Structures are given as structure tokens and as C-alpha cells.
Amino acid sequence: MEFRGDANQRIARISAHLTPQMEAKNSVIGRENCRAKGGNPGFKVAILGAAGGIGQSLSLLMKMNPLVSLLHLYDVVNAPGVTADVSHMDTGAVVRGFLGAKQLEDALTGMDLVIIPAGIPRKPGMTRDDLFKINAGIVKTLCEGVAKCCPNAIVNLISNPVNSTVPIAAEVFKKAGTYDPKKLLGVTTLDVARANTFVAEVLGLDPREVDVPVVGGHAGVTILPLLSQVKPPSSFTPQEIEYLTNRIQNGGTEVVEAKAGAGSATLSMAYAAAKFADACLRGLRGDANVVECSFVASQVTELAFFATKVRLGRTGAEEVYQLGPLNEYERIGLEKAKDELAGSIQKGVEFIRK
């Protein structure tokens, strides 16, 4: 019967990710021993909110990333189902699922990169600030877990409103004594993706050939595309500038309204989050000249946080770039963005300090 025992052990080992909470603590087939053979060495990544609208697609995309060796999927509901589904993909990353607050610490321990899309989505008529009351508490709890279990991890924060949740995360980490401003990155990549796409449509180019810096924040007028700095260099009429700026700023609303109550920009956001996460992993690997836009602690303006291009490296955002020359339209837009951002940042700070 030794053969049957070996077979049962193999079955338990490969299925441990489906119900990790049921693994015996003294088992020789614990989670740390569950590794696919032949996988390339890589980074350990956790997605918090993996069963949500963004999280499911993001889990799929991160499972496909060759730089990921271990992928932890956490949520308060439905995490086992998403984990089982994604784990059947024949890519190198080993997947583990974690369900509920009691398993948050296990999900986070030892992670190199933590991606947080957790929270409620936007619905028709809602602004990102309408999400604040619920999502602020979620981000606080999750970041407390990060501070305790993987204080050196790079954090990619997606949960809206990013203009407030990034300051919330910073205050949580400061309280815990683990704050490293280079490692807290608000994900604004979707604004850049939209800008590249919409500008490419106007210019008749492939979006992959276009690069539009988008600075400021991640909501409404705080989203400021710098069309004067588009690559390849291009000129636009005043009407085109107005059209492009408004469409980029309201891209999220465009999707929410088009889905008519059935969701928000989950697919494009997952794509953008995966793209930014890949950039962070390439930075961690030591690749040179990895540059993306992100909402980070900044001295570019008088505000504590601001989205600009950053150079990503082994320690996170290793360099924050200046804005560069702005035209009159952009200078006016910058002042509007800063006025709005100041209140959003303060709102996040006060949520923790109150």
C-alpha cells in the first residue's frame, strides 16, 4: 500500500493551492514545498482582490508573466474558484489561493510585489470619490497586512480613488515604521494607455508607436495629458487638444456608461495593471531604463504626491522625473489638477490621522 500512500501525497501536494487552509501545519507537503518542477526562478507576487472584476483578469495576465514564479491570489470571497481556474494554465508560475482575513498574512508573507485592486467598482453616476468611504477602509486593512508581513515589497495600488488611497497607504506604513516612498506606487497606467490609444486614432498611427506623458493624478481634471510632449513629435489643433484631453480625463466614465450598470473599466484596467507590474518586475530584475508614469511621493510640485514619469529599479521608483516644458493650455490644466489633488490627498491623510 506504499504506492497508494505516495499517490495520495502527490495528489495532496498538487491540490494544496485549492484549499490551503486545510493543510496540516506539520505536513511535509506544506505550501513552501509545493513547487512546479522546471519553472524559471522569478518573483513572488500577491494580488489582493483577485476575485473582483479587475482581479480575475489581472490574475490571468500575471500567471502568463514569465518573471513571476509564485502567484498568491487573495480575496474575501471566491478566491478558491479563481485560483483553481488560473492554476490550470500551463505557464511557469505556481498559484496559491487565500480566502478571508485569517489568511491575509499567509498570502503576503515573503512577497516581492503586492498588487491591490481590491474594492468596490464604479457604477453609473458615481465618481471615484464616491468610492472613498468603503475603499479607504479596505486599503487601510490590506496595507496593515503588507506592513506586517512583507514590509520590503513594492506595492502597486489600484483601488480608487488612487489620489486618496495612496496617501492612506503612506500613512499606514508611516505608523508601522515601514514607509519607503520609493516602494509605494499608484497605478495610473490606464490613463497613459488611453492617451496613447486616442492620440494614435487622431494621428492615424499604431498606439504602440505613441508615447503620451500623463501627469497629475488619476481622476477627472487631475489627469493631465502633456500633448506637447507626445512622441513622435506631433502638432494638434486647439479643437483636437480639447477633444483629446476631455476624452482621456473621462475615459473611465465612458466605459461605465457604455456598460450601463454592468461594470467599470475592468478589462483595460487589468491590462494596464499587468503592464505596470511587468515594468516593476523588470526593474526588480535590474533592467535598465524602465520608465512608466505613476502616482508617487514627489517633489515635482508643492504637493506630497503627484503622477509623473518614474524610473523603476531594484528599490522601486528610483528616480522621479520633472514635468518638462509645458504650453499655456497645460500650465492652466496643471493648476486645476493641483487644486483638485490637494483636497484628495488631504482627505486620505486625514482618514488615518483622525
From Swiss-Prot:
Gene3D superfamilies: Lactate dehydrogenase/glycoside hydrolase, family 4, C-terminal, NAD(P)-binding Rossmann-like Domain. It is an enzyme of class 1 (oxidoreductase). Keywords: Glyoxylate bypass, NAD, Oxidoreductase, Peroxisome, Tricarboxylic acid cycle. Signal peptide: none annotated. It catalyses: (S)-malate + NAD(+) = oxaloacetate + NADH + H(+). It is found in: Peroxisome. Disulfide bonds: none annotated. Its EC number is 1.1.1.37. The active site is at H218. InterPro entries: L-lactate/malate_DH (IPR001557), Lactate/malate_DH_C (IPR022383), Lactate/malate_DH_N (IPR001236), Lactate_DH/Glyco_Ohase_4_C (IPR015955), Malate_DH_AS (IPR001252), Malate_DH_type1 (IPR010097), NAD(P)-bd_dom_sf (IPR036291). NAD(+) binds at G49, A50, A51, G52, G53, I54, G55, D75, N135, I158, S159, N160, M269. Homodimer. Belongs to the LDH/MDH superfamily. MDH type 1 family. This is Malate dehydrogenase 2, peroxisomal. It comes from Arabidopsis thaliana (Mouse-ear cress).
